[in-house]
Amino acid sequence: DDKRLLLDLLDASASLWNELNYERRQQFFDGESVWDTADYRKQYVDVLGSATAQQIIRKNKSAWQSFFAAHKNGEDTAPPGYWGNEDEGRELRTIIRNDQYTLETGERSRVEIPVGHALKDEYGLGYHDRLRLEVCGAPKWDGEQGRLEIQYDEIDDTFRAFQPVTVPDSRQ
């Protein structure tokens, strides 16, 4: 079931963010460097795929860099937070690198995203298969695609995708 597979992918993404963020928060509050962390990519590559794990790690690093920049400027800010928790529910989301997904729009719009081998095995996908999902709605802009962020809205029981694009100067 594609929905279950996507939910598992989003849950693993949130788990990666939370584990990495927990280690960085502990180091921060202990007065240590937040940049020396375990290699979480290796722990999650089988479920998320290498590029997706890398994107989540990069987004977490960027969140910490923003925190330190604001902190340095004297802003009253808190360290990056968690994407929910296992008991009360995680904020289910993931980030797909711009060269790792394809979006086709038209009469039957769809997006194809990579998943790790463990999820492929669990859900019966072939080695080269990707998760193919129907897309509703149409992009407001077209241009060079950025990374794709997918979030699950539990209240509406729907998935939302956010895709930044770079629009050429001549069309702005």
Each model region followed by its residue ranges:
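Nucleic-acid substrate recognition interfaces
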Residues: 1-172
